[in-house]
Amino acid sequence: MARNKIALIGSGMIGGTLAHMIGLKDLGDVVLFDIAEGIPQGKGLDIAQSSPVDGFDSRLTGVNDYAGIEGADVCIVTAGVPRKPGMSRDDLLGINLKVMEQVGAGLKKYAPKAFVICITNPLDAMVWALQKFSGLPKTHVVGMAGVLDSARFRYFLAEEFKVSVEDVTAFVLGGHGDSMVPMIRYSTVSGIPLPDLVKMGWTSKEKLDQIVQRTRDGGAEIVGLLKTGSAYYAPAASAIAMAESYLKDKKRVLPCAAHLSGQYGVKGTYVGVPVVIGAGGVERIIEIDLNKSEQKMFESSVATVQGLTEACVKIAPQLASK
């Protein structure tokens, strides 16, 4: 039986972490791609030399040519410039849009049947552009944001309640940025909704509001602490959850930046919503009921994303006709 082939476009901190996690989870063979000569080869060799200790048989190959990703089952895109202190994700748009054009051409030529997970920021605009540049089916091009934002939300809630993260369910809607919408009403601790936990005296509305804001600022907090780059362990783990659900047809319900074609009243935009990921890619988009406050925040988040996609079209007018 042929092993899965997983291509990692970009061999920086997230790319290297992804490669190691793929080996540890035995998800398949890895091709690390990067335009910088020696980087993917060196990281691939380093991780391969950990395999006798960690006990995995994944083959790791480093390449500088898109031909190396040919026939990949999954492609995870991290290529581009990461944030530095004082930068917003949106500040990266002009630089990373050009990167997405190159990546899209590579995917179109060498991996047109792949399931593609985009991590590059500003996420919602970059995954939208990548789908257009590549021409791959919208069900097979998704953005990794909601899984990460939801994981941060869950972690902060578990810390507040002093319970296991395994017993906290929570998710985030909307764009991957300051306008994201952590869904308090749909978040629970062992099935108990957060509003009920406030009534029970476990926490206060003010404390929950602080946790929501810390979730929105989660990436910036890490950027500020690292000073030389951005988060990579949690983003990599989040993308692996998505890839594993696709490769194993697990049909997990995961919040992802998915293409909406009328759901939530939105058309032609990638935005974070809960979806089912299985062997067919994004097999279903789950529409949840939003109250007036949630709807207003979601619409504001969508408007922010649409502003970014319009900025993309100004830089690359050909996107308007794709």
From Swiss-Prot:
Its EC number is 1.1.1.37. The keyword Metal-binding does not apply. GO terms for molecular function: L-lactate dehydrogenase activity; L-malate dehydrogenase (NAD+) activity. It comes from the Bacteria. Keywords: NAD, Oxidoreductase, Tricarboxylic acid cycle. The lineage of its organism: Bacteria, Pseudomonadati, Pseudomonadota, Alphaproteobacteria, Hyphomicrobiales. NAD(+) binds at G10, S11, G12, M13, I14, G15, D34, N96, I119, T120, N121. GO terms for biological process: lactate metabolic process; tricarboxylic acid cycle. Catalyzes the reversible oxidation of malate to oxaloacetate. NCBIfam families: MalateDH_bact, PRK06223.1. This is Malate dehydrogenase. It catalyses: (S)-malate + NAD(+) = oxaloacetate + NADH + H(+). The active site is at H176. Substrate binds at R83, R89, N121, R152. It comes from Mesorhizobium japonicum (strain LMG 29417 / CECT 9101 / MAFF 303099) (Mesorhizobium loti (strain MAFF 303099)). The keyword NAD applies.
